[in-house]
Amino acid sequence: MVIKPKSYKQLAYEEIKENIIKGIYKPNQILNERSISEDFGFSRTPIREAFQRLYYEGWLVTRDNKKNVVREFNLEYILMNQKVRTSLEILAVSESICKFKESNIRDLEKITNEQEQIIKEGNFYNYIKLDRKFHEYIYLISENSVLTKILSNLNDTVRYFGQIALSYPNRQELTVQEHRRIIDAIKKRDEEKAIETMRIHMVNTTDAIEYSYK
């Protein structure tokens, strides 16, 4: 099977969105088409097409007659997003708990151990990737393709808002502790406990986001 190289439009889209998610492009920052095309070494056409897609997905807005403004998500929107995500995360752990094999549990433990090591190294972005990997592994084990697809569509906003939550003091360390409690409940095949520990984990994440917005 021949893998086609990504188009300039796709590369521009991915890079610009990643810069927004990582906070390189700040909320309310105006993105200059010419400047970005020069930075990327692309013509302005793929940059313009990438902007159009980012508008459609809600990452860019027009504000005060100024185009290509990085969207600033208000707290109300973030809390609605978290409410939906919490319900889905609980469903995922509920549907997966009886399907976990010992090897799967070891995989979750390995991810959590890697998170602890990353905290010591101070690699914030790799920590976030591992955090997503932990939750995505649970979705995978659930074998619920609809649930996995919905959560996959939320992935970028989850990463973006997760960075806000993890800026809360000691939140990274606390997240690892909460992940270990979830794993412990899965080991015991205690569905009620797994649901409750996941719910608490998500509530604490939401609280950290609210705190960071104050």
What feature does the model see in each segment?
Residues 1-98, 140, 210-214:
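Short linear motifs at protein or domain termini
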Residues 1-5, 191-214:
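C-terminal effector-binding regulatory domain of bacterial HTH transcription factors
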Residues 33, 144-145, 189-190:
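Short loop-to-helix capping motifs
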Residues 74-75, 161-165:
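Short alpha-helical transmembrane interface motifs in multi-pass membrane proteins
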Residues 81, 98, 102-163, 177-183, ...:
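Conserved amphipathic alpha-helical segments that form helical-bundle/coiled-coil interaction surfaces
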Residues 7, 105-106, 170-173:
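Short helix-capping and inter-helix turn/linker motifs at the boundaries of alpha-helical repeat units
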Residues 42, 188-189:
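Residue-level signal for the nucleotide or nucleotide-sugar donor/cofactor binding architecture
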Residues 65, 88, 110, 174-177:
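Alpha-helix N-cap/N′ positions at the starts of helices
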